[in-house]
């Protein structure tokens, strides 16, 4: 596997991990908000995780789009 493929897969894995982390945290907030005692401002914190989720999804979409628009790219 060449470096380009490794870099592509590293970025893809990073964004997928960020998406999974944000979704897991949001699931906790939605199902048991009292379980997160150190964050009394639940809406503000949830909004921050929504922003993290949206950013990671956008980056992943962009990365995958680059692969589609230039199939000669070696990844």
Description of each model-found segment:
Residues 2-75:
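Extended, charge-rich alpha-helical interface modules
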